[in-house]
Amino acid sequence: MAARDLVFQPGDRVRTSGRFVSGPDGDWLDLQRVHDLTIKPPGWKSDLSIRLIGADAAAVPSEFGPNQVPGHITVVGRWHAPAPGEQVRLGDESIEVETQTPEGPPPRPRADRTHPPCLPPPGGWPQNVVWYEGWPQSAVSDLDLDIRDLESSGAMVHRAIFRPSEDQEVLVVAATDVEAVTRGLSPSLPNQLCVVRSRFTRAQLDEVRDVLHAHFHEWRLEVFGTGSSDSQGQPFATAEPVRVTPELAAWDDTLPKGLLLLSPTITPPEIQHPDRQAGG
């Protein structure tokens, strides 16, 4: 699926999930996914809220259930917004609700980190974890190595801890210079290190980060970063826009496949799980 498949225009049908808010100024769906710990007054909504037309306040769930969070709903309906290029203010965008279900936002995808992408050493990965007051401790999780040279040179692109079992920890490193990283880390992590050749360089990830930062407000990004990796330990960048605009999609299509994962809050209705690897 290409990024352009996530683009929609005024009048198109869309799907989204969020927190239902009702007040004197009407019904809203607050799409904010990243929250701080401050207590908000009743009826508060973020600047990522969309006006709802025809929502059923009585059908909003008040209790937890399977894939159900109090106050949260999923809607499908017609998208209304100013023409492209016009300034968007709170309340200018709305969804004319066709269907409403008591479903919360879909969970963020999480990579499986139980199977390191390297063959285990003879005898298997060591039982190297000691639990202390409910927290795992090992040479991997307590890593105290000077890796600044490996990171600054670009030899080490990303590192993550894999846990084949609760008593095992393996450091998985995606590297552009496998030999240098192996030579630098293996003496301190015998039989606890897995180094794979990175699909992307640190420079590629940094360039994506810089572009996302420069267009943060224009593309209405809620959060972005370059610290993620998949089940093979391969790094990628992430971005969570409210929606994928034509401009964001055009830039995304220039990227190598797998370099960026887009997770828009609002999508065309046929797309159930918008998390996808970009550049395709």
Where are these regions (language model features)?
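OB-fold and OB-like single-stranded nucleic-acid-recognition modules
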Residues: 1-235, 240-280
